[in-house]
From Swiss-Prot:
CDD domains listed in its UniProt record: LDH_1
Protein's recorded name: L-lactate dehydrogenase B chain
Family: Belongs to the LDH/MDH superfamily. LDH family.
Main EC class the enzyme belongs to: oxidoreductase
GO MF, one annotated term: L-lactate dehydrogenase activity
Predominant location category: cytoplasm
Pathway: Fermentation; pyruvate fermentation to lactate; (S)-lactate from pyruvate: step 1/1
Gene symbol of the encoding locus: LDHB
Reactions mediated catalytically: (S)-lactate + NAD(+) = pyruvate + NADH + H(+)
Length: 334
């Protein structure tokens, strides 16, 4: 006796398992991981989304919650498991997992604890998706991108840190607010380490090709009567402020990550400030990852733009690199 499905649907092609074209995996279903997931789904970037975490109930709940929204999405398959086999054939893997900094904990100690987590995660990712591109989001992102590159054995163009993509977006938003234009029309770059020692490239800030530093030569310096330097200070402090107010940041970083993924999956060759291996650039001698303007396309991070930086900006970049190396050189088991 034929089932209802057999009566309803007459097959034309043989049934076979299809390999997804644009599968994306998100590792870690905390606030940041789920913001990445919903941003990816909202932009219809993937034909299969896989979620992985160690907390099975939370993981299943998040998966079901997203699946129940399938009618409103263009992603036919949403899966989740604590076993990494669920991630097989991913084009892009987003790593948001990691331990949180405890009160009074040193950065080195936090990084070392995250290294121990990544030693389990990264080999599993590469085992099931040897051709994937990994985007590292977990903090401290620049050091953990280096750790991921070391542990994965992947070429450096396929290991990318979310880096200063969000810092630069915050910078452009805050400047645009002051000027009364849309952030997309206000161009400016934050480079270096994501966070406290980031570098605002004031020499490159422009609106419609007009260099703002030509209009106000003191822009970004301590002598500036309009105090534009405050904008960069606000960028650095903004995450701390949001965390103080709501406990964590997630929406903006989720949108930022989806933006990076779009550039790669759609082969756009857009330029983003993301964390890459900078050894040999700007006189940096060690194997550190920092944000520079990078071209992202289907192959990953394919080139770096040589920005004309002023001497003080180069000095700040080198300072960032030294800070990171100071922590990296003492990491164990890499």
């Amino acid at each position: 006796m034929a089932t209802l499905k057999e009566k309803l649907i007459a097959p034309v092609a043989e049934e076979e398992t299809t390999i997804p074209n644009n599968k994306i995996t998100v590792v870690g279903v905390g606030q940041v991981g789920m913001a990445c997931a919903i941003s990816i789904l909202g932009k219809s970037l993937t034909d299969e989304l896989a979620l992985v975490d160690v907390l099975e109930d939370k993981l299943k709940g998040e998966m079901m919650d997203l699946q129940h929204g399938s009618l409103f999405l263009q992603t036919p398959k949403i899966v989740a498991d604590k076993d990494y086999s669920v991630t097989a054939n991913s084009k892009i893997v987003v790593v948001t997992a990691g331990v949180r900094q405890q009160e009074g904990e040193s950065r080195l100690n936090l990084v070392q604890r995250n290294v121990n987590v990544f030693k389990f995660i990264i080999p599993q990712i590469v085992k099931y998706s040897p051709d994937c591109i990994i985007i590292v989001v977990s903090n401290p992102v620049d050091i953990l991108t280096y750790v991921t590159w070391k542990l994965s054995g992947l070429p450096k163009h396929r290991v990318i840190g979310s880096g200063c993509n969000l810092d630069s977006a915050r910078f452009r938003y805050l400047m645009a607010e002051k000027l009364g234009v849309h952030p997309s029309s206000c161009h400016g770059w934050i480079l270096g380490e994501h966070g406290d020692s980031s570098v605002a490239v004031w020499s490159g800030v422009n609106v419609a090709g007009v260099s703002l530093q030509e209009l106000n030569p003191e822009m970004g310096t301590d002598n500036d009567s309009e105090n534009w330097k405050e904008v960069h200070k606000m960028v650095v402090e903004s995450a701390y402020e949001v965390i103080k107010l709501k406990g964590y940041t997630n929406w903006a970083i989720g949108l930022s990550v989806a933006d990076l993924i779009e550039s790669m999956l759609k082969n756009l060759s857009r330029i983003h400030p993301v964390s890459t291996m900078v050894q040999g650039m700007y006189g940096i001698e060690n194997e550190v990852f920092l944000s520079l303007p990078c071209v992202l396309n289907a192959r990953g991070l394919t080139s770096v733009i040589n920005q004309k930086l002023k001497d003080d900006e180069v000095a700040q970049l080198k300072n960032s690199a030294d800070t990171l190396w100071g922590i990296q050189k003492d990491l164990k088991d890499l």
